[in-house]
Amino acid sequence: MAALWVAGVGRKSLTVVASGAPRREFWSRLRKEKQPVVAETVEEVKKEPILVCPPLRSQAYIPPKDLQSRLESHVKEVFGSSVPTSWQEISLEDVHMKFSFLARLADDLGHAVPNSRLHQMCRVRDVLDFYTVPVQDRSKFDELIASNLPPNLKITWGY
């Protein structure tokens, strides 16, 4: 360790010299020289225009006539051929079995269970109830246009 000694005492400052160098020179050796900051060029990405009317999220779904037999055959494929007679009461607690069962049904019927309803599918009966409900792809405005409106009320899309 270098010996410190006071080189001079003034009224406003105290100069300390370590190993023969003034304080400013001592600390300046430890500082790294600052490199000039180079600004990177950023390419401007043009965004696509926002659509005026977003596409409909759900597609039309009409349940087939043989829905129960299709469901029963998928239950036998996924859960094995030794399915009890009350196949609608089979529990869907096993996540892997539930996924494979619902994925096969979605491929077969062309209509998938949305994520917001997956937690409600606890038994095969819940899945059957979901797939028996038909889905229309029309909005409320389309239904209003198709309904019998009074002559003083008219809905136009091209405004």
UniProtKB/Swiss-Prot annotation:
Organism superkingdom: Eukaryota
Keyword check for Mitochondrion: yes
Cellular component GO terms held in the UniProt record: mitochondrial inner membrane; mitochondrial large ribosomal subunit
Protein name stated in the entry: Large ribosomal subunit protein mL50
InterPro entries: Ribosomal_m50
Major place of residence: mitochondrion
Keyword field contains Membrane: no
UniProt keyword terms in alphabetical order: Mitochondrion, Ribonucleoprotein, Ribosomal protein
Complex formation: Component of the mitochondrial ribosome large subunit (39S) which comprises a 16S rRNA and about 50 distinct proteins.
Coiled coil region boundaries: none
